[in-house]
């Protein structure tokens, strides 16, 4: 459960990232294809279960309509993509898996509190002027992906941020340790 958020968070790194114990699963294939589409250099040794990601030469823009579909973790790309590109625009909500489509509202609320501007003019638009800013947020309910969105947005933001009612599962803690190591 930790690998997808960590792969999304790798977009926050200014240099190459090396990861191990990467399983060859469909969602990772989709995420790797998306990363390559936006200009990332990926070296994935499936036998050794290692991956080297370098996002230092990303395209200057991208079509967010090309976010990986059919995976719940697509929403975890919002904060890293905003950090990199300053704006994203979506035709529709990212679709989920058989477990159900995840709500976007908690993610949008968090991004807004951390300084993002949200618009709904026929498309969902999210933008930031510079960097995310520190904020305090009380989550209505514990959510792993909402907590991960908050942590990724706050990690490189200006000032201190606090999320009350955060999820604390081991894979959320793995993401936090990864971000601290960058």
Which residues does each PLM region occupy?
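Structural preference for solvent-exposed beta-strand-turn elements
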Residues: 1-182
């Amino acid at each position: 459960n930790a690998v997808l958020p960590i792969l999304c968070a790798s977009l926050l790194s200014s240099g190459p990232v090396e990861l191990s114990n990467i399983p060859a699963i469909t969602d990772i294939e989709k995420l790797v294809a998306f990363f390559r589409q936006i200009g990332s250099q990926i070296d994935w040794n499936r036998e050794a279960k290692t991956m080297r990601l370098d996002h230092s030469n990303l395209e200057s823009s991208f079509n967010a309509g090309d976010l990986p579909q059919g995976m719940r973790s697509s929403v975890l790309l919002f904060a890293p993509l905003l950090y990199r590109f300053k704006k994203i625009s979506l035709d529709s909500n990212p679709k989920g898996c058989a477990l159900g489509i995840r709500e976007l509202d908690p993610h949008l609320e968090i991004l807004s509190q951390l300084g993002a501007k949200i618009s709904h003019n026929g498309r969902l638009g999210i933008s930031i002027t510079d960097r995310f800013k520190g904020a305090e947020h009380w989550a209505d309910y514990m959510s792993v992906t909402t907590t991960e969105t908050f942590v990724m947005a706050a990690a490189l933001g200006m000032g201190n941020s606090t999320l009350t009612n955060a999820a604390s599962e081991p894979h959320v803690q793995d993401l936090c340790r990864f971000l601290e190591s960058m």
